From Swiss-Prot:
Gene Ontology CC annotations of this record: host cell nucleus
Residue positions of motif Nuclear localization signal 1: 87-92
InterPro entries named among the record's database cross-references: HTLV1ZIPPER (IPR026220)
Name of this chain's protein: HTLV-1 basic zipper factor
Family: Belongs to the HTLV-1 HBZ protein family.
Region listing for Disordered, in residue ranges: 48-162
Annotated domain remarks: Contains three nuclear localization signals NLS-1 and NLS-2, corresponding to two regions rich in basic amino acids, and NLS-3 corresponding to its DNA-binding domain.
Subunit note: Interacts with host ATF4; this interaction inhibits viral RNA transcriptional activation by preventing ATF4 binding to Tax-responsive elements. Interacts with host CREB1; this interaction inhibits host CREB1 transcriptional activity. Interacts with host JUN, JUNB and JUND. Interacts with host EP300.
Lineage start: Viruses, Riboviria, Pararnavirae, Artverviricota, Revtraviricetes
Annotated keywords: DNA-binding, Host nucleus, Host-virus interaction
Ranges of biased composition (kind: Basic and acidic residues): 70-87, 94-114, 122-160
Length: 209
């Protein structure tokens, strides 16, 4: 939604409506809630996976390795030690894998927190910058309007003082003065361009030698 405010004589300029900023803040809030919901779903999925691994590990410890039967007759002490060592090795590998998954999950969480923090800081900086720019724009419009009103009042007083004919002659004199100043500036520009061309020619001649 856009409103219009008066600036100077018979002019209306658009300004941002507070409802636009409110809608933008609501949209940003909904996006943040959606990201938090996705993070929670991911966290629940990882926790479910860890619990499943733990339950599977406990079941294997109770049942023994798949297909394992009663120790065969004549099994030596060294065989039992080797089997126990293999079990400990598998358990250690599972624990290492679980620790790796947990570390990766925590790392992703920290990275996401850092991204959200950077987005929040950037958003706050953008909001502050827009507010500052809006304030400066309003102050500039106010100064321009005040200056135009002052000039209009001065012209009106001068016209009343000199009359229509006198004020017209004064304006014509000002126009002639400005035209003379413009011609002077053009002549100075031509002189400078001529000097530049002169020195450029000198430099080119030196390079050719």
């Amino acid at each position: 939604m856009v409103n219009f405010v008066s600036a100077g004589l018979f002019r209306c300029l658009p300004v941002s409506c507070p409802e636009d900023l409110l809608v933008e803040e609501l949209v940003d809030g909904l996006l943040s809630l959606e990201e938090e919901l996705k993070d929670k779903e991911e966290e629940e999925a990882v926790l479910d996976g860890l619990l499943s691994l733990e339950e599977e590990s406990r079941g294997r410890l109770r049942r023994g390795p798949p297909g394992e039967k009663a120790p065969p007759r004549g099994e030596t002490h060294r065989d039992r030690q080797r089997r126990a060592e293999e079990k400990r090795k598998r358990k250690k590998e599972r624990e290492k894998e679980e620790e790796k998954q947990t570390a990766e999950y925590l790392k992703r969480k920290e990275e996401e927190k850092a991204r959200r923090r950077r987005r929040a800081e950037k958003k706050a900086a953008d909001v502050a910058r827009r507010k500052q720019e809006e304030q400066e724009r309003r102050e500039r419009k106010w100064r321009q309007g005040a200056e135009k009103a002052k000039q209009h009042s001065a012209r009106k007083e001068k016209m009343q003082e000199l009359g229509i004919d006198g004020y017209t002659r004064q304006l014509e004199g000002e126009v002639e003065s400005l035209e003379a100043e413009r011609r002077k500036l053009l002549q100075e520009k031509e002189d400078l361009m001529g000097e530049v061309n002169y020195w450029q020619g000198r430099l080119e001649a030196m390079w050719l030698q």
